[in-house]
Curated annotation (Swiss-Prot):
SUPFAM superfamilies: WD40 repeat-like (SSF50978). Residues 20-79, 397-429 are annotated as: Disordered. This is DNA damage-binding protein CMR1. Belongs to the WD repeat DDB2/WDR76 family.
Length: 595
């Protein structure tokens, strides 16, 4: 009780002191004079926090008048009338300056360019070495191997090369694989890659995110290491081992500052490289003449060319774009005027994009396409040329029309090196033809995946199709010798339910996300062994898989720290494969010590 009495006396004393303080300040203890109205009585004896002292006012610095020069003012608001000629000249001059900046920033390529002029920030002696090396490659004939033309289609489609003994033979070829090279070939993320077929060399050609072509002579003499430059090989070298043991690298700005979407070595003799990019062009780089030539291009920069493939003659190419178009380029003399055409086969929208196209090496009139609408389709291109089309105004015709001079009606003006399509068939025209009796054989087969289909490729024999899909599966479609693809009398059989479906399904994580290049399983072009393909694995391995769906080998070491999303194989050396990653680094794998 004594403690409670003492506490109560102390509390009353505190209340009295607080009331006296409020009275001295002229404040009502009940809060009636507060502008915020009454507030509930305090429930505790917490002391009121002390008010913070007001910050000291800083003296404003003296304003110093600075002559900022003339300011831009609106002539329209000021009511001034611009001099017509002077104003027009000024606008044209500003437009020219913007165009120059655009060309410089995009690194736009001319129609025909010398390779030496496409190399940037490289010493002259290294450019000469590159030119000499490419010309030495051109002197070596390396035609691509195709199925024998004497074999009938029905015999060729017999599935007799996937017996267990062939699978074991392939596994034996990939024994004792090891990492032979790990070199930064391009400055940016790898988008596409291929290996030249020359057996005595390992020439890897790499396309990156910004139109740069990396040329890697993996077995060539090492380049001298520049002074004060850190090692970027990425391999753990043994003590005393010389640096730069991984060949020579040259970098060429092959396209404008856009991703190189696809590359193919000239199938006739290996003396050049065909490539497409998001700058909407198809180009050919000749190793013998050392010139890069534009073969095909779109005026509309929104029509990104996603993929292409060549016919065995290398005189024709099929391309697919973002807006659902299939385009054809033909350089033969008889097709000079009509050799550039486009057909829109996908309806406009998110599913319009065609991400892949492949030409059947046994029957080149058949192509397969991979679409964002989840479908893989097989087309008979012989029917496409029967579809009605409209003339596409060329750049020259548009300029003439703007200047008041027009070409004759019904004719399409062309420049000496005009590469734009001359005719186009829109989606409604294509679908109308497809629904007509004449268009019965245009689409030979189709199959729908669970999600978008990223790629579709015919194997080197023309007997199977390999697809990659975002539904996390790789699929192999075997062609029946009695199907409509082989026998024209059975047209339409593969369009029936269950008429065309995968024979092998391999589960594979294809969720690359935003920052990795899309996975595309790629057939090996080597025809000395059973059909097999390579594909990057999200667990950072490079997988080799047979056409039967059996995993042959998964390649990985501690030195590989990124996913090899882009893969390729040496066409004539079965156990030599490469993988490329986001940093522009390429890993070369091979077995034994012969490399």
């Amino acid at each position: 009780m004594d403690e409670e009495t003492a506490y109560e006396l102390e509390r009353q004393k505190t209340i009295a002191e607080n009331r006296a303080l409020l009275d001295s300040l002229g404040l009502d203890p009940a809060g009636a004079s507060s502008p915020f109205g009454s507030s509930p009585a305090p429930t505790s004896n917490k002391t009121k926090p002390k008010p913070k002292p007001a910050p000291k006012k800083r003296k404003a610095a003296a304003v110093i008048a600075v002559d900022e020069g003339p300011r831009r003012r609106s002539g329209r608001i000021a009511g001034l009338e611009a001099d017509g000629d002077a104003f027009k000249a000024k606008v044209e001059e500003e437009e020219k300056e913007r165009e120059i900046l655009r060309v410089v920033s995009r690194k736009e390529r001319e129609k025909v360019m010398d390779v030496g002029k496409m190399v940037e920030d490289t010493p002259e002696d290294e450019i000469k070495d590159m030119e000499k090396y490419l010309q030495s490659i051109a002197e070596l004939s390396n035609p691509r191997t195709y199925p024998a033309g004497t074999v009938s289609a029905r015999e060729a489609y017999a599935d007799s090369d996937t017996v267990p003994s062939e699978v074991q033979r392939l596994k034996d070829a990939f024994k004792d694989m090891s990492l032979k090279g790990n070199t930064k070939v391009t400055n940016e993320r790898v988008f596409s890659m291929c290996v030249h077929p020359e057996k005595t060399k390992t020439l890897v050609l790499v396309g990156d995110k910004y139109g740069q072509l990396g040329i890697w002579d993996a077995l060539g003499p090492p380049m001298e290491k520049p002074e004060n430059e850190d090692d970027t090989s990425g391999l753990l070298r043994a003590e005393g081992e010389d640096e730069y043991q991984e060949g020579r690298v040259w970098r060429v700005q092959a396209h404008a500052k856009n991703s190189i979407s696809c590359m193919k070595v000239d199938p006739v003799n290996g003396s050049g490289l065909f490539s497409t990019a998001y700058d909407c062009s198809l180009r050919h780089l000749s190793f013998s003449t050392l010139q890069s030539t534009e073969l095909f291009s779109f005026q509309d920069e929104d029509l990104l060319i996603n993929h292409f493939d060549l016919l065995p003659s290398a005189q024709e190419a099929w391309m697919v774009d973002k807006n659902g178009g299939i385009s054809h380029w033909d350089t033969r003399e008889s097709k000079r005027e009509s050799g550039r055409r486009r057909w829109v086969v996908q309806e406009e929208g998110r599913g319009a994009k065609l991400g892949g196209v492949s030409v059947n090496p046994l029957m080149p009139h058949l192509i397969c396409t991979a679409g964002n609408d989840q479908h893989v389709r097989i087309w008979d291109t012989r029917h496409l040329f029967s579809i009605s089309s409209n003339l596409v105004p060329s750049a020259a015709a548009i300029e003439e029309e703007e200047e008041g001079t027009s070409t004759l009606s019904g004719q399409s003006s062309s420049l000496p090196h005009d590469t734009h399509p001359t005719r186009e068939s829109d989606y409604s025209t294509v679908t109308s033809y497809l629904a007509s009796p004449r268009g019965k054989g245009l689409m030979r087969a189709k199959w729908q995946h669970g999600k978008s289909c990223s790629s579709a490729y015919w194997d080197p024999w023309g007997r199977r199709i390999l697809t990659t899909s975002y539904d996390d599966h790789l699929r192999v479609f075997n062609i029946d010798p009695g199907s409509s693809l082989v026998d024209d009398r059975a047209v339409g059989s593969l369009l029936q339910p269950n008429g065309f479906k995968p024979t092998k399904v391999v589960r594979h994580n294809c969720q690359t996300g935003r920052w990795l290049t899309i996975l595309r399983a790629q057939w090996s072009l080597n025809m000395e062994y059973m059909p097999h393909f390579t594909v990057g694995n999200m667990k950072r391995t490079l997988d080799v898989v047979s056409a039967t769906g059996e995993k042959i080998v998964g390649l990985w070491t501690d030195d590989v720290t990124a996913v090899p999303t882009v893969t390729a194989s040496h066409p004539n050396i079965v156990d030599r494969v490469v993988g490329g990653n986001t940093s522009g680094r390429i890993q070369l794998w091979s077995s034994g010590d012969h490399i």
